[in-house]
């Protein structure tokens, strides 16, 4: 597996993204890694989110540029 750049809720074309789970609505979630205040933070991404949601400092931060975990 490897981290691949993504942005704005779009998945990298031609890549198999590792699924991380589902929202209660059934929307797929993917493993994300992004930066909040200079710190790399794991979180979730989904096409329906328009970015990645990253928990940090007791809050959930939304970032537009992040990485998603993909199969090689």
Show the residue positions of the predicted features.
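A structural motif
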Residues: 1-72
């Amino acid at each position: 597996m490897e981290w691949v750049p993504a942005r704005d809720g779009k998945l990298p074309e031609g890549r198999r993204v590792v699924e991380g789970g589902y929202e209660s609505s059934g929307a797929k979630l993917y493993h994300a890694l992004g930066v909040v205040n200079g710190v790399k933070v794991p979180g979730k991404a989904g096409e329906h989110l328009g970015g990645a949601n990253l928990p940090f400092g007791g809050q959930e931060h939304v970032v537009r540029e992040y990485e998603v975990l993909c199969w090689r």
